[in-house]
């Protein structure tokens, strides 16, 4: 790659966007070496998750030039793979989303690829739905999921509505590498592309069919009379993202109408002013909702992230509100689905549930209890989507009952191939109604599962390594763990080291290392695929909560030192 200063000068000479040009000129005038290096030391990597980065000027930023270059590469791939390709496009509430959508659609149109565009902000699951419903060759969603406000991203999908395969990502990445951001991108005027029918708006009927599919996949055995006898009261926050209309629409049609929306987080706002990190995994993002719960006393709090593919839940637990973890909600939902289906007389031994290698071991206990086949895949919901697609290809998609990952992504149904907070919000409410009729809330239900199967506790630690130096340090840490793995962790002997860069259980190779400790506890280390972070997943089982938490804390302390 060229010298960062040469790249800066090239961008100053070629950039037409006034905002980006001003940022570039400021970098040069101030001589801020750290800023220049971080903006230009690498190209944003295009992988199975597409692109993701902070918004701004440079090759390592999300802007119309990096988005345009990626789109040209995607268009080249589509034209080489499909005859008369079409692409569905959506965006969440993030800043620059509309600009990136129009830039992308105009480039696709100039390359002979028909672009079908949602006219308003739309959740990730509705994009996956549109790809399948409209029989598109692919899809693109402008989103950075639950990253902080300075981020945006470019999520690419295949014709099955699942995030693109590794093979497709490699082919697109190669095409991108051969494209000059300033001279190699074909484009045309967006409005002209609309007039010529090369860009078309996705109408409301597509979204209506999505709602119908979600409602058809609800899971409840309760009668209307039973539901009316225990009406659910809900506080909901879309965290200034895309979830408000689809989530409340689906809940209302399912008869769940007592919904109070957090007013400060109701409207779309890419600055996320009330929660700089709009991630329903963390209490800070949920705090406005919890404060409102203290006033209206609902049965539960639901929060969807900006692109409404993840959902978090909080329930009253003593004097405070408990945030259920992704693993806890995953096992609660899976247990509820199994109970409900078994009560209908379904043979669960013919069913398949899917989770990841970093999800709770309690799922294995559920599989033993109910008899379903459990499949574990690599981290990333695309791998769960791939398994659903493979079942569909063999005419066995009805076997799939549930998939989840520990990072608050869930799917019960084959209508889409990505995590779906809209349909999961309905499922969570149906489950809450089931337990409410028994005089319980979801905290009570989770306590019963712990008492029955054991206290499987989990914790995820994220350590940040920003900038060019951080990327090198992350690579060095992972290399060091492979070359000189520790003999013990938290005073426990490491009985096995599993390197997923070699073929493990038929899974694709991945930059993941697992340390299996004596006593059945373990730690898993993997770099994030979307942020400059290394994640440490800790797993512990105890006779009670205190014992499990003590083990978690001990492993965390040792793990932080190991990754420092």
Task: Provide a role label for each language-model segment.
Residues 294, 298-300, 320, 340-526, ...:
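Phosphate-binding and adjacent anionic-ligand microenvironments
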Residues 86-92, 233-236, 411, 539:
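Short glycine-rich or small-residue beta-strand-to-loop segments that form or flank ligand, phosphate
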Residues 126-184, 306, 317, 406:
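Active-site phosphate-binding/coordination module
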Residues 40-60, 144-147, 238-250, 306, ...:
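Conserved phosphate/anionic-ligand binding catalytic regions in large, soluble enzymes, centered on
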């Amino acid at each position: 790659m060229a010298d960062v200063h040469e790249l800066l000068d090239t961008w100053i000479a070629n950039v037409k966007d006034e905002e980006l040009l001003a940022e570039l000129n400021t970098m040069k005038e101030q001589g801020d070496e750290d800023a220049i290096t971080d903006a230009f030391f690498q190209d944003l990597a295009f992988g199975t998750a597409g692109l993701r980065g902070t918004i701004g000027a440079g090759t390592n930023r999300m802007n119309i030039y990096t988005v345009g270059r990626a789109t040209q590469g995607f268009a080249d791939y589509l034209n080489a793979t499909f005859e008369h390709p079409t692409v569905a496009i959506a965006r969440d509430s993030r800043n620059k989303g509309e600009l990136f959508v129009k830039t992308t659609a105009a480039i696709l149109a100039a390359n002979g690829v028909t672009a079908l565009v949602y006219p308003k902000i739309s959740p990730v699951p509705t994009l996956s739905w549109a790809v399948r419903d409209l029989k598109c060759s692919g899809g693109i969603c402008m989103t950075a999921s639950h990253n902080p406000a300075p981020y945006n991203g470019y999520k690419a999908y295949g014709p099955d509505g699942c995030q693109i395969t590794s093979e497709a990502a490699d082919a697109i990445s190669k095409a991108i590498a051969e494209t000059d951001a300033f001279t190699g991108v074909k484009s045309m005027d967006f409005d002209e592309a609309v007039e010529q029918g090369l860009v078309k708006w996705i109408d409301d009927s597509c979204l209506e069919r999505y709602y119908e599919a979600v409602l058809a996949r609800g899971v409840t055995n309760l009668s209307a009379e039973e539901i009316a006898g225990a009406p659910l009261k809900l506080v909901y926050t879309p965290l200034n993202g895309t979830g408000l209309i689809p989530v409340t629409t689906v809940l209302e049609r399912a008869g769940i109408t007592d919904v109070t929306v957090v007013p400060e987080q109701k409207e779309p706002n890419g600055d996320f002013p009330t929660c700089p990190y709009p991630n329903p995994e963390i209490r800070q993002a949920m705090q406005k909702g919890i404060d409102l719960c203290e006033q209206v006393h609902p049965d539960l709090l639901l929060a969807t992230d900006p692109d409404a593919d993840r959902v978090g839940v909080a329930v009253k637990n003593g004097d405070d509100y408990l945030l259920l973890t992704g693993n806890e909600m995953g096992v609660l939902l899976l247990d509820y689905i199994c109970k409900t289906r078994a009560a209908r007389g379904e043979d669960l031994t013919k069913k398949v549930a899917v989770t990841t290698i970093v999800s709770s071991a309690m799922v294995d206990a559920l599989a033993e209890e109910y008899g379903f086949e459990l499949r574990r895949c690599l981290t990333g919901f695309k791998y769960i989507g791939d398994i659903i697609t493979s079942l569909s290809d063999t005419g066995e998609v009805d076997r799939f009952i549930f998939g989840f990952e520990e990072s608050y992504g869930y799917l019960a149904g084959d209508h889409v191939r990505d995590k779906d907070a809209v349909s999961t919000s309905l499922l969570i409410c149906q489950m809450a109604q089931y337990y409410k009729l028994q005089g319980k809330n979801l905290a009570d239900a989770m306590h019963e599962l712990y008492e029955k199967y054991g206290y499987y506790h989990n914790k995820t630690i994220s350590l940040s390594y920003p900038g060019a130096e951080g990327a090198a340090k992350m690579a060095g840490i992972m290399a060091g763990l492979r070359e000189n793995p520790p003999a013990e962790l938290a005073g426990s002997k490491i009985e096995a080291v599993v390197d997923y860069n070699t073929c493990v259980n038929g899974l694709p190779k991945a930059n993941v290392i697992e340390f299996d400790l004596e006593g059945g506890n373990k730690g898993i280390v993997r770099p994030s695929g979307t942020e400059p972070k290394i994640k440490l997943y800790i797993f512990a089982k105890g006779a009670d909560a205190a014992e499990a938490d003590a083990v978690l804390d001990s492993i965390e302390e040792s793990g932080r030192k190991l990754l420092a």
